Amino acid sequence: MAKDARLVRDPHQKEIVRLFSAFDGSKNRRKIFEDFITVSACAVSNLLDTVHYEEREKRYLDTIRQYKRNEIDVFAKMYGQIELGVEEKPDQDFLGEMYMALDFGSAAAGQFFTPYSVCQCMAAINTDYDRLNAQIADQGFIGVMDPACGAGALLVAFANECEKAGINYHHSVLFVAQDVDYIVGMMCYLALSCMGCAGIVCIGDSLLNPITFHDSRGLLPIDTDGRIWYTPQFLMAPEWAGRQLAARMDLFAHGGRSKREPEPAADETPAIAPPSQIQPPTAAEEAETPVVISPEPEKPVEAEETAYGDNEFGQLMFF
């Protein structure tokens, strides 16, 4: 384990690696790590999410019963190291970096996380923070989505860049993440939760089964199979609870639509005479008026707007 500890840099990462030695040899390190992520995510979710409580409590118990009492206590110590590591140095990919350093990634599935330094560069260069500030002033908050989030490094980097730009991401940014891999999606969920981000994490293929919402602001995700995970900040902060309530009231008022389509005004309807009042042209008028047949010009095909707005900022999509 001492050799493995040299693979990671953060002292709290090193402590987690050291704690692996407390488990017996019946399970390999990757299995222990994945079970640790599962029980930690379920415990965080069940603090406030009553909708998914029973399902996740069962998953928690099914996982934890595979371990001895002293090993369960080690899981609690490992989670404490995540909290301490993120609190002391929020500008890092705490879990993702450790996951790759210990070679837990799936090379067969092409699972290689973007280095955090690259994520920092992407978040700093590709984002127009003046525009985002203007949107926050106009609409109250912005939404940002990473459709292939991994352990959440790009969203974490974006949150830290928001703080540098004077944007309070706890109250003014809604983080939406999706990944096809359950474990790395839960790593992203823990990262966003520990940073106090108001977030929604969806487990699933973002191409074949992308996350969808009842509303246009991304506050009310459609969840039919328990794949949606809400961070504590999203459920507990008064401003986010108020925004969700307002979105539900808007849906109720508009019959299930988040935006009511404006009805045409009475004077906008063109006046069309009934067929009985339409007079055919005279022979003289037909002779004087040349008939020119020309093909109707083709209308340019407009790109359909995505559910999350444009993605001119690269992998991150804003809405």
Where are these regions (language model features)?
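Histidine (H) residue identity feature
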Residues: H12, H52, H170-H171, H214, ...
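Conserved S-adenosyl-L-methionine
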Residues: V118-D223
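Intrinsically disordered, low-complexity boundary segments flanking structured domains
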Residues: Q81-G85, M187-Y189, E304-E305
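Generic preference for hydrophobic/aromatic residues in regular secondary structure cores
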Residues: I16-F20, V173, I228-W229, F234-L235
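Homeobox/homeodomain signature
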Residues: L102-D103, H170, Y308
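S-adenosylmethionine
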Residues: A191-A198, C202-G314
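Class I S-adenosyl-L-methionine
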Residues: A2-G166, L316-F319
